[in-house]
From Swiss-Prot:
Keyword Membrane among UniProt keywords: yes
Family, as annotated: Belongs to the UPF0259 family.
Entry superkingdom: Bacteria
Organism: Cronobacter sakazakii (strain ATCC BAA-894)
Name under which the protein is recorded: UPF0259 membrane protein ESA_01554
Record InterPro entries: UPF0259
Main location: membrane
């Protein structure tokens, strides 16, 4: 059977519209959890003020120079803030991916499931999913940091890994390996969706200052919810595409 991107986009849109309320609640809940974790673990205002002390900011031409020119105390605060942001974001993403994938599976099986139940039912999957997201995020960011293009290619070929882990009960490295093979063979169907997702998230970052004007906490939840909705759309597309490819 010939698979066209247009038909998969249509199926994705139909599913998203039919399950909009549940998907929105999952996206909002995960964004709220990420914000709360980030707020709990991020250094307080007095500690963050240490980062602006000295000439490290003005005398540094690159990120590496900036870190090298910092005092040990400043480096410790920066590390703590970065770790808090990374962990809270990854934890929220893990809940989102797990909840959305369980929702898709349940609806495909003819079952009605709430946002909380979808996230709760994904609990057995979350530890492996967290490690998978950590590894793929690390590889993609390193690729983007080096030359950009390798990072984008990695984002494309690894995009099916969470779907394979949930649907086939695959292990972490097996899911990554199989995703690379399958996505590479179906690049014309996978790449446009992932690239659109990356561009949409980049565009969302441009509006981040406007969201922050609402108050940092509310802005973070609004921006996080919108970002999560974009990710949910991509997951629905990839899940539908994977099921069609398997047929």
């Amino acid at each position: 059977m010939s698979i066209t991107a247009k038909s998969v986009y249509r199926d994705t849109g139909n599913f998203f519209r039919n399950q909009l309320v549940t998907i929105l609640l999952i996206a909002l809940l995960c964004a709220f959890i990420s914000m709360m974790l980030g707020h709990a673990f991020t250094p307080n205002a007095d500690q963050l003020a240490i980062l602006s002390e000295g000439d490290a900011m003005t005398n540094s031409a690159s990120l590496f120079e900036l870190v090298q020119n910092m005092t040990p105390e400043q480096q410790q605060v920066l590390l703590k803030a970065s770790a808090a942001s990374t962990f809270s974001g990854m934890f929220g993403n893990t809940l989102l991916v797990g909840g959305v994938l369980v929702l898709i599976q349940a609806v495909s099986a003819g079952q009605n499931v709430s946002a909380l139940r979808a996230i709760g039912a994904s609990a057995p999957l979350l530890p492996r999913l967290f490690i998978l997201i950590f590894l793929t995020t690390f590889l993609v960011q390193m690729g983007i940091l080096l030359v950009v293009v390798p990072g984008v290619i990695l984002a494309i070929v690894l995009s099916l890994a969470p779907v394979m882990m949930a649907q086939d009960k695959a292990g972490i490295f097996r899911a990554m390996r199989n995703s690379m093979r399958l996505a590479w063979r179906n690049m014309r169907l996978v790449a446009p969706a992932v690239l659109l997702w990356l561009l949409a998230r980049a565009a969302l970052l441009l509006f981040a200052p406007a969201f922050a004007a609402l108050t940092p906490q509310i802005g973070a939840v609004v921006a996080g919810t919108l970002s999560n909705l974009l990710t949910a759309l991509l997951l629905i597309y990839l899940f539908r595409l994977y099921m069609l490819i398997r047929e």
